[in-house]
């Protein structure tokens, strides 16, 4: 009796998630075009998917950050400091580019609901006051109410405290982190069904206008990533090595960025990057540390995604943003981006943290995350390509700068 089901199961497990999401997206569009009444009913599937994301996100951020800080190994710094600085400068610069682009070309999203109870902040002073109150929130309440800033504060604090714990305790935290990550991966496997429901109901209600909104959003996102890859990063590298950066930039994009675009995983691209560093003749003790580290904290693409989608939500809801608050968002996006590598679904699940700066409720923020999943086919690939290629680029720039200093001495 179960035999006929096996080919379908086999097909689902063998087909990549990207292909399944494309199928879900196309199926949702077709259903909305030809059977709008039925499309509205399957919107329930999308709601279930968003609710699952909403449920798992606070626990994920808390456990992941706490475990990563607790298990961080001290020592072995040699040439890592200048590379770390480049990683931080690159990520912050990407967030600033995204802020400028979002102000120049504001994007609007089609959201299912826009609650009237929102109280947007009046300026930087109010934002900082709310930020401080969020930081000192009760940890249990922070998890229940999805207060991501409070969750982050407690996770960092406990992570630092657990660094002095026994090996067995730190191993337990690692295993707990692995368990939560596995649950997230299971939720993400249902993304094609969730996207199908979301796309079908969204286009049945809003029609082609929603598609135009996503197209504009994609252009802004990909435009920012291309600008960072071909203008900002080369400028940073030029200031470091004092010669034409483009041969190195193009090599990194071709050798590392292309594979990362299709694997959509910075971690999976680490062996490719290590091999490229070896071919470039870089210092092995340096790149063996900086490349895995970069796959964790060097997240220019994630900073762009978090910033652009957050400001798209802000613009959609009619919230005014002053310049100091935008700068604060750049900092928050950079910090959030550093934690994006450990999250299945990348930077998207960290958007609620940035949205909370502007008083945007969790349910609206998770709708923005759902929009992110709809455009993730291109966004996630481009984001990973930028992140991973920049790991090699900045490592090579720092190594070449050190060699230049040594030869000049």
UniProtKB/Swiss-Prot annotation:
Keywords, ordered alphabetically: Amino-acid transport, Cell inner membrane, Cell membrane, Membrane, Symport, Transmembrane, Transmembrane helix, Transport
Keyword Transmembrane part of the UniProt annotation: yes
KW Disulfide bond (keyword) present: no
Pfam family of the protein (one): SDF
Location, primary (coarse class): membrane
Positions of transmembrane segments: 17-37, 49-69, 83-103, 142-162, 180-200, 218-238, 299-319, 331-351, 357-377
Record's bilayer topology term: Multi-pass membrane protein
CC terms in the record's Gene Ontology section: plasma membrane
Any single biological process term in GO: serine transport
GO molecular function: neutral L-amino acid:sodium symporter activity
Compartments reported by the entry: Cell inner membrane
Superkingdom of origin: Bacteria
Catalytic activity entry: L-serine(in) + Na(+)(in) = L-serine(out) + Na(+)(out); L-threonine(in) + Na(+)(in) = L-threonine(out) + Na(+)(out)
Alphabetized HAMAP family for the sequence: Ser_Thr_transp_SstT (MF_01582)
Family: Belongs to the dicarboxylate/amino acid:cation symporter (DAACS) (TC 2.A.23) family.
Functional summary from the UniProt entry: Involved in the import of serine and threonine into the cell, with the concomitant import of sodium (symport system).
Protein name, UniProt field: Serine/threonine transporter SstT
Organism whose genome encodes this protein: Pseudomonas paraeruginosa (strain DSM 24068 / PA7) (Pseudomonas aeruginosa (strain PA7))
Gene name as annotated: sstT
């Amino acid at each position: 009796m179960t035999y006929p089901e096996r080919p379908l199961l086999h097909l689902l497990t063998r087909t990549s998630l990207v292909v399944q999401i494309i199928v879900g997206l196309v199926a949702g569009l077709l259903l909305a075009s030809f059977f709008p009444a039925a499309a509205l009913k399957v919107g329930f599937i999308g709601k279930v998917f968003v609710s699952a994301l909403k449920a798992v996100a606070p626990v994920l951020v808390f456990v992941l950050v706490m475990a990563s800080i607790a298990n961080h190994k001290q020592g072995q710094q040699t040439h890592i400091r200048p590379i770390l600085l480049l990683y931080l400068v690159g990520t912050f610069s990407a967030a600033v580019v995204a802020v400028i682009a979002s102000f120049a070309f504001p994007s609007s999203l089609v959201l299912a609901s826009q609650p009237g109870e929102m109280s947007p902040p009046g300026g930087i002073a109010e934002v900082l006051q709310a930020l401080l109150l969020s930081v000192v929130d009760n940890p249990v309440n922070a998890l229940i109410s999805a207060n991501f800033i409070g969750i982050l504060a407690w996770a960092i604090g406990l992570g630092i405290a657990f660094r002095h714990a026994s090996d067995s305790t730190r191993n337990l935290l690692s295993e707990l982190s692995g368990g939560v990550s596995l649950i997230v991966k299971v939720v993400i496997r249902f993304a094609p069904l969730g996207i199908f429901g979301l796309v079908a109901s969204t286009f049945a209600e809003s029609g082609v206008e929603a598609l135009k909104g996503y197209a504009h959003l994609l252009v802004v996102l990909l435009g920012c990533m291309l600008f960072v890859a071909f203008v900002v990063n080369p400028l940073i590298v030029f200031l470091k090595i004092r010669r034409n950066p483009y041969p190195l930039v193009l090599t990194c994009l071709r050798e590392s960025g292309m594979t990362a675009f299709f694997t959509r995983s910075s971690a999976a691209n680490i062996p490719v990057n290590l091999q490229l560093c070896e071919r470039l003749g870089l210092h092995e003790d340096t790149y063996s540390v900086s490349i895995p580290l970069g796959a964790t904290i060097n997240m220019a693409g994630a900073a762009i995604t978090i910033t652009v989608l957050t400001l798209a939500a802000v613009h959609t809801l009619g919230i005014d943003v002053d310049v100091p608050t935008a700068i604060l968002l750049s900092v928050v996006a950079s910090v959030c981006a550093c934690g994006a590598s450990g999250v299945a679904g990348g930077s998207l699940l960290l958007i609620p943290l940035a949205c909370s700066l502007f008083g945007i409720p969790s349910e609206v923020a998770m709708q923005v995350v759902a929009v992110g999943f709809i455009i993730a086919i291109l966004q996630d690939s481009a984001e990973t390509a930028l992140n991973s290629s920049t790991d090699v680029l900045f490592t090579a720039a720092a190594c070449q700068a050190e060699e230049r200093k040594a030869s000049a001495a």
